Curated annotation (Swiss-Prot):
Known catalytic reactions: 1-(2-carboxyphenylamino)-1-deoxy-D-ribulose 5-phosphate + H(+) = (1S,2R)-1-C-(indol-3-yl)glycerol 3-phosphate + CO2 + H2O
CDD domains registered for this protein in UniProt: IGPS (cd00331)
This enzyme's EC code(s): 4.1.1.48
Gene behind the chain: trpC
UniProt protein name: Indole-3-glycerol phosphate synthase
Key words, A-Z: Amino-acid biosynthesis, Aromatic amino acid biosynthesis, Decarboxylase, Lyase, Tryptophan biosynthesis
Organism: Acidovorax sp. (strain JS42)
GO molecular function: indole-3-glycerol-phosphate synthase activity; phosphoribosylanthranilate isomerase activity
Length: 266
């Protein structure tokens, strides 16, 4: 685990402990299980791909540890609507909302605001290190959760996936190298995210996705993450057979995020 990732995960341990003092595990589980039906995250991606379009998970992110504040004019509901509409022809399949406070200046309310403003399924983008967070995610309204292989041992990762499935949530499992991919493929989820950013050095290379794609079975849906900034990046990946993408920074820096999405994936 990289230094920054370890630092983030250590903070998460403290955050989960504090959260459980406010709302017990039992109460959070009860809240999660009482929530209304989820939106079909995987189905939304596949529907776009079946139409010949890219399946885009458009991210709502105010800041990051490596770039600082990315978007000053940050209104999650407006951004979500912009993503859903695109240019009227090309729009997002799903949303990803950062809820981490300390490192990404996110918060759970951003997820709630985004989901309430449009019909798209929503991924809670955070660093999951405890089963409590899976129940918490459903209570917040998430339709999908992120499990980062580098943060989790196999047994815990499988347990957290099973909890998510029991709540009818999708799981996006994220990897960066072959060893992590091998572990991720033991899970049942069809969604496999390949992060092109090295969390140790923060260097980004699309070659990471191109290399690892060869090891991803055809029944899994590969999602390319990070470093997708220009049409040439999209063309490179699509030519290699990649059809799903998680993109944030390129849109967050644009005046109209939805139009930027449509232009990137035209």
């Amino acid at each position: 685990m990289s230094d920054i990732l370890k630092k983030i995960c250590d903070v998460k341990v403290e955050e989960v402990a504090a959260a459980q003092k406010r709302v017990s595990f039992t109460d959070m589980r009860r809240d999660a299980e009482s929530r209304v039906l989820t939106r079909d995250f995987v189905g939304a991606l596949r529907a776009k791909i079946d139409q010949g379009q890219a399946g885009v998970i458009a991210e709502i992110k105010k800041a990051s540890p490596s770039k600082g504040v990315i978007r000053e004019d940050f209104i999650p509901a407006d951004i979500a609507q912009s993503y859903a509409e695109g240019d009227g022809k090309v729009g997002a399949a799903c949303l990803s909302v950062l809820t981490d406070r300390q490192f990404f200046q996110g918060q759970p309310d951003y997820l709630k605001q985004a989901r309430a403003s449009c019909p798209l399924p929503v991924l809670r983008k955070d660093f999951m290190i405890d089963p409590y967070q899976i129940y918490e995610s459903r209570a917040f309204g998430a339709d999908c959760v992120l499990l980062i292989a580098a943060c989790l041992e196999d047994g815990l990762m499988a347990e957290m996936e099973q909890i998510a499935r029991s709540l009818d949530m999708a799981v996006l499992v994220e990897v960066h190298d072959g060893a992590e991919l091998e572990r991720a493929l033991r899970l049942q989820t069809p969604l496999v995210g390949i992060n092109n950013r090295n969390l140790r050095t923060f260097e980004v290379s699309l070659q990471t996705t191109l290399d690892l794609k060869k090891e991803v079975p055809a029944d899994r849906l590969l999602v390319a993450e990070s470093g997708i900034l220009a049409p040439v990046d999209v063309h490179t990946l699509r030519d290699a057979g990649v059809n799903a993408f998680l993109v944030g920074e390129a849109f967050m820096r644009a005046p109209d995020p939805g139009r930027a999405l449509a232009q990137l994936f035209a």
